Amino acid sequence: MKINVIRGTHQFGGNAVKVTSDSGSAIVLDFGAEFAVNGGRAIVAEGITAGKPGVLGVLISHSHKDHAGLIHTILPRVPVYMDRIAGRIYRTYSEVTGRPEAAAAGKMKALPPLCGKIEFGDITVTPFLSDHGTYRSEMFLAEADGKRLLYTGDFRLHGLLRSELLSGLGSLRGTVDLLITEATCAGRGDEYSTYVPSERTLEKSVLEFLGKSPVILFCSIINIDRIAGLSGLVRDRGGRVFVSWAEKRVIDEAAADDAPPAAFYSNLSIPETYDSSLFSDVRAGDLIFTSSFEDFRILSGMIPSAELVFTEWPGNLAHMNSAFREDPRFHVMHVSGHAHPAELREFAEFLLPRAVLPVHTSSPEKCAELLEGFRVLPLQDGEDFTL
């Protein structure tokens, strides 16, 4: 089995990993858009975006654009796969946000259910549950030529699905030849885990605010687990939950079939537009979700009694003026979707792979230090490695 990281050995986002069996069967794991800070470059790859089709499929681990955002550039005859519900959510998200990959997202094929198998030539792939703050994030086990690799996509161990993630992978312990793991936080030090709260910490803090005030909470439109969890807690306490029409469209996709039960959303009030009369009776215990910086600002002025909770990466605060950020009601509670340094070590010790290949990182050398005792591969983008 041959591994080639098309992009991702020395940068965040824009992941793409090619896996080829000895007989020539090939697949690609993720095909993400590069962040603007890295240049926003497309991927030009023979057999994937150019020339004749040379891979049997592209598998997307989760619905973030840095892992799925270039699917519209893939050759039409190369099928793209994603979890069934996650794919529908990504299609809807792409439509409501005007993403260029919206049409391609609507044509994706569904992967089998968790722990089901799908074959691409002589490569067998099994999806496993992950936790990244997007509904149905997945890890992929690829098997060929008597070898096994596990590709994590993005993951964390401080989310709501920690126990389910680890228990699902328990049978793989000690059997994985290569762990291809995200290492976003590898260079940030152990102190990182002390100032990034868990999802449970966030829920506790929001409930404390709701005990005395309404709360306006900024989070990603596709963070269904967070929206569902907080909505359920608010509902149980007799509060109301407000979302915009865009969030409602995504929620409708998540509430279908075997996704989170619709009861989570039974008390939602859905404003088409924000106006002062809609929020005239907002009271303590009510929760307003938004994923729009402009709406966050407008709502904060319309509801002066509300606490303002920002749960995304603090670097995104550059979109807001300093006066807004200095409002005493404003609280940054970023719950990372990425494994803390200690969690990267914990995960490797749990899985016991024979070798580790860090991706989605600007600090692969830090990952090698963090995973002392494990064989960590220092690959470059475009470099082949044979298991």
How would you name each of these model-derived features?
Residues 32-33, 182-190, 244-256, 334-340:
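Short connector loops at secondary-structure junctions
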Residues 64-66, 85-87, 113, 246-248, ...:
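Short, polar loop motifs at secondary-structure junctions
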Residues 37, 86-91, 225, 248-253, ...:
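Short, charged/polar "capping" segments at the starts of alpha-helices
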Residues 11, 236, 267-387:
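C-terminal regulatory/interaction regions
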Residues 2-59, 65-212, 216-225, 229, ...:
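His/Asp/Glu-rich metal-coordinating catalytic cores
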Residues 92-100, 232-234, 253-261, 319-327, ...:
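Short, aromatic/basic amphipathic alpha-helical patches
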Residues 191-297, 301-302, 309, 359:
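Hard-cation-handling environments
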Residues 78-88, 180, 240-249, 308-312, ...:
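Short internal beta-strands
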